[in-house]
């Protein structure tokens, strides 16, 4: 509602894997970033641009977390976008972020032998998935997160910052400095990778976690269970970007 209150029309929808689970993959396709998220976003952009109430050249894509990571790909496959907004978008390989995330959360809650064994198993899986598509890949080791081979092949091949750098449209990257899932390291990679893009803008927020909730100290998963709206100053920044007032960011 924050953007709508600022006069910006918004279309939100459930990611198809959340809404339909395994049934979301079309016949003849495999689960990957496109079938999970990109295809639907591209279709929605096309539908929104066709609405008579809106100027077709005024449509932006805003993505959070995986949506932010995929925003450059969505833009590359869409026609006539005005810009993209990346909220807490991962810039590093997914397996690297997962390993860091699981070690972080385990350090907050449990250091038992059982948890250590689980982490060691995950580390082995993540190291192995980097070898997917090579002779060194071990078929006897399970793939992380229960995702299929097609998903990880796609994830390994996708380079979000490189894709974003080739776009000829405004980009706004926002990041919470207390985020342990997508970190300031990712923010730095976006910033350095888009250094030559004159229409790329960046802003980080000291108090915000991955869900853009305010807090202090080390962020924890328990924060997510408390309802907390995105702060007005973040909404103001997004609205300014959409209205072309980048000099105020």
Segment roles from a protein language model:
Residues 167, 173-175:
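Short beta-strand/loop motif that positions the catalytic acidic residue
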Residues 30-52:
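Alpha/beta-hydrolase active-site loop
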Residues 208-211, 216-249:
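Catalytic active-site module of serine/aspartate enzymes centered on a nucleophile-bearing elbow/loop
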């Amino acid at each position: 509602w924050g953007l709508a209150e600022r006069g910006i029309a918004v279309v939100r929808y459930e990611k198809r894997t959340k809404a339909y689970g395994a049934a979301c993959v079309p016949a003849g396709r495999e689960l990957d970033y496109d079938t999970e998220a990109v295809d639907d976003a591209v279709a929605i952009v096309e539908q929104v641009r066709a609405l008579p109430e809106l100027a077709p050249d005024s449509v932006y894509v805003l993505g959070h977390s995986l949506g932010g990571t995929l925003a450059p790909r969505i833009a590359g496959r869409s026609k006539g976008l005005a810009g993209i907004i990346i909220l807490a978008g991962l810039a590093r390989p997914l397996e690297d972020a997962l390993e860091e995330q699981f070690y972080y959360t385990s350090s907050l809650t449990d250091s038992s032998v059982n948890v250590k064994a689980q982490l060691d198993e995950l580390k082995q899986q993540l190291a192995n998935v980097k070898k997917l598509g090579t002779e060194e890949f071990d078929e006897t080791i399970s793939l992380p997160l229960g995702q299929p081979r097609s998903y990880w092949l796609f994830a390994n091949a996708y380079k979000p910052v490189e894709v974003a750098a080739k776009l000829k449209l405004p980009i706004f990257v926002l990041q919470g400095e207390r985020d342990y899932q997508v970190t300031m390291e990712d923010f730095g990679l976006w910033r350095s990778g888009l250094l030559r893009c004159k229409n790329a803008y960046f802003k980080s927020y000291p108090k915000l976690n991955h869900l853009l909730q305010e807090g202090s100290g080390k962020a924890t998963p328990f924060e997510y269970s408390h309802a907390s709206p995105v702060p007005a100053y973040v909404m103001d920044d997004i609205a300014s970007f959409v209205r072309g007032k980048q000099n105020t960011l």
